[in-house]
Amino acid sequence: MKIGVFHRSLNPMGGAEHVCLAVIEALKELNCEVTLVTMEPTDWSRVCKLNPKIMKPDKEISILKIPMKFLSTYLKFYACHMFGMLRRNFDLSINTHGDILPAPADIVFMYYPVIFESKPLPEKYYKSLLWKIYYQPYLLLKSMFPINFKWKLLLTFSEFGKNAIKKHLSSEAIIFNQPVDIDEFSKASFNNCRLNRVVLCGRYSPEKNYEFAVEVARHLPYIEFIIIGSISNKGYESYYNKIAHLVKEYDLKNVKLLTNVSRETQIDIYSKSKVFMHTAVNEPFGIAVVEGMAAGLVPVVHKSGGPWLDIVKQGEYGLGFGSVDEAVESINIAIKNYPSLKIKAIERAKTFSKQKFIEAFKSLVLNLI
């Protein structure tokens, strides 16, 4: 069976990319011929460095022959149109990035309906005539695409995402557990000799809200903070520089910023740390939180979105915060009560294993065909 998998780009290697790779692995186990369709060429050397145990597709089609740098706002609509044309060549089509790519497919994964959410425009779009001219056609395209955005099955990863999809798309989504490589991260959980250290992990992107972590670190000079972040484009690099500037401005000796580290290095850091902090607000899920928990770190997350509602279950399996003072208090509690909180975190993480996702997705595909 020929199956097409559509994803914006694997290069960021965030949670959505791990879902895409797990989908490919599941399809390969079913002996399907898998074609990955992306907007830009995949940097496989980078992807394999960050996740060595991946299964590549049989073929890859890059709609753009060069990396995305300009006009990406508009190019995603062109990519959706092209995938709509290409899907005719497949027996089954899967869109693993339905959040921002409204391309019709038999199966659509959507963390959160980002592209359909009504938000206030950034200041530059209504203060600058040039930006107004640039942005108006996008708003028109955005309003047109929901008409043709169809699927047989719509999947999401949290109650938070399910409720948002219901609100913005008036559609019912099926909740699927996020695929997390529990086995690999759980190796780190056996080490009990750990530092009073807080780890954050995710791409260097503004929505990760690392400024908040820097502010918290100012109040906890006796605790080390490490931010492990990926940089795959100029935008991420710019945000990294902003955070690095803050750390330097505050002269924080207890904050370390790492970029594009290997999975081996990441797990080694986890094995010697006690707390995993997640500062993003209204994150639809947060795969990094589960990875940290599997490695034996106590989660301390913002009281919003999937991490708070679906992963730590509003304090049952970790701690939360809504302010800097509350974050400081939660980190101190997590370190003080580390042994007992660690056990809860590890047990909770086991419910999100990649193998469980693969088996469930294989059953879903077999029932669909």
Task: Show the residue positions of the predicted features.
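A conserved mid-protein helix/loop that constitutes part of the nucleotide-sugar donor-binding site
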Residues: 18-22, 205-219, 238-239
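Nucleotide-activated donor-binding/catalytic signature segment of Leloir-type glycosyltransferases, i.e.
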Residues: 240-261
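Aromatic "clamp/platform" in nucleotide-sugar-dependent glycosyltransferases that forms part
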Residues: 281
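A charged, aromatic-enriched C-terminal amphipathic alpha-helix characteristic of glycosyltransferases
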Residues: 322, 336-367
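Short alpha-helical donor nucleotide-sugar binding micro-motif in glycosyltransferases
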Residues: 268-273, 361
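Membrane-proximal helix-turn-helix segments that form the acceptor-binding/catalytic region
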Residues: 126-154, 160-163
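Short hydrophobic beta-strand element within catalytic cores of glycosyltransferases
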Residues: 298-302, 312
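Glycosyltransferase donor-sugar binding loop
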Residues: 224-242, 259
